[in-house]
A protein has these predicted regions:
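Charged DNA-binding/catalytic regions of mobile-element recombinases
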Residues: 1-179
Length: 179
């Protein structure tokens, strides 16, 4: 395992001739218009007081070069599950589609980080996307005694911690890189 800061990471990537292609238009990764059950926002005005009190999750896209694609690039989707207290990324998955199964993989990775004797309240907060509202995703949460929480009316500010880590990953860690 190697740990490097943003600037060293950028320097290494520059030395290797790798650059990220940034797009000016946003890609929608959230479909909040569905008939799946949604859950109330349980973290509004709540400050996380310990690790594994609140987890936040979101999905972002990363553009990659693909010579077989008509325009020479395509997108992959990164799901991140992060502890809101420690800001530690506990689970992640890079996937070719937005299917819920990939978000579940990130959640399951995060669950594996919990202590065996963990029995405190754990809230999982996300947007209202179909991945997070799917029966399969909710089942993994409830089977592991995790309480679902979702943004109100699709407001990204209600999931600001997760949105911020996405911004950091794309615009600081991966800035200028090509995949």
């Amino acid at each position: 395992e190697y740990r490097v800061g943003r600037d060293v990471f950028r320097s290494i990537m520059h030395e290797q001739g790798l650059h990220l292609i940034r797009r000016s238009r946003a890609i929608r990764t959230t479909n909040s218009r569905h008939n799946l059950p949604t859950y109330p926002n349980l973290i509004k005005n709540v400050i996380p007081m310990r690790p594994n009190h609140i987890w936040v999750s979101d999905i972002t896209y990363i553009e990659v070069e693909d010579s077989s694609a008509p325009n020479g690039y395509r997108f992959v989707f990164l799901t991140i599950v992060m502890d809101a207290y420690s800001k530690r990324i506990l689970g992640w998955c890079v996937a070719p589609t937005l299917e819920a199964a990939y978000s579940i993989k990130a959640l399951e990775m995060a669950i594996k980080t919990l202590p065996k004797d963990f029995n405190d309240t754990l809230i999982h907060h996300s947007d209202r996307g179909t991945q997070y509202a799917s029966a399969a995703y909710i089942k993994v949460q409830t089977d592991n005694h995790i309480i679902p929480s979702m943004t109100e009316n699709g407001n990204p500010k209600d999931n600001a911690i997760a949105e911020r880590i996405n911004n950091t990953v794309k615009n600081e860690l991966l800035h200028g890189m090509t995949f």
